Amino acid sequence: MNNDGTLQLDGNGNPIPTYTQAQVTAFANAYTGWTYPTEPGGTLVKHNPQYFLGPMELFENNHDLGSKTLLLGTVLPAGQTGTVDLQDALDNIFNHPNLPPFVSGLLIQHLVTSNPSPAYVSRVANVFESGTFQGIGSGQRGDMQAVIAAILLDPEARRGDNPATAVATDGHLREPILYVANVLRAFGATTDGAQPVNYATNMGQAPMRSGSVFNFFPPNYIIPGTTMLGPEFDLQTTATALVRINFVNSFAFSSLGAGTTVSFGTYANMASSNPGAMVDALNALLLHGTMSATDRADILAAVNAVPAGTNQATLQAETAIYLIASSSQYQVMH
């Protein structure tokens, strides 16, 4: 992998493999011997029973003592303990030149945009290697404070601050768990998590239950009918898209069950005296002030169409919240 995240190719234009099956086996051997933590009052055995309260423990007699050839030809000598082999194997991966662009690219996709430019990835990868960014960081390789600062303060990330400078590939779809959490958090909701978790699960993302060790969606997923990457769109179907809409509908107009409480009183009070100001406040809260004039006019028209009555102001606030939080402009995070 090049420092900008693009693949290195051989003379025939094929990607150059980073590792072989033999190296995968060597890493597996380096990790042998580790088992579940011992339960209180128990005794460490070769295969401890499932117990999750604590770090894994090493049963040394179950560790492979042979030599292991890892990435870049690094050899772990025979006879090392399981703890030393584990640390050396992790160091071998951490110091591989592919790691900075690989990790940087994935972090950018999760935090800023599904389609970072190679130059963006390269800038962040360089910070990963140096461990410092504009005075932030320890100077050690992989310093996450420096890396995250470089990601969020990069010009390619900050151009989204001004809708006029944004481009079509900016941003990324909020994955279900973050979509649900962000809506709840925006309005100060409290919850036992039951119904919100059900909604996220029905959107295709059951918390802590990824279908594989490679996360809920692949980083190289291309949105059908386009050439754009959109990892989170791998979970998006007609059915899950409707679940998103139904979630916001229940949140705004009814409830998410007895375990979740929220109040829209602040916005209802604003709607009772100035519906336009209420829409503007929600624009600032949910869209950071990026709502277009056309969208504002349409939402305000829907708000003003709510018939007069005892609950008019509340329904006006709920209508605006529903329309904004279910919109593509909100669901795609910029």
Label every PLM stretch briefly.
Residues 1-117:
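Non-catalytic, conformational "gating/processing" segments within enzyme and secreted inhibitor domains
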Residues 96, 100, 104-144, 149-334:
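Flexible, low-complexity segments enriched for small/polar residues
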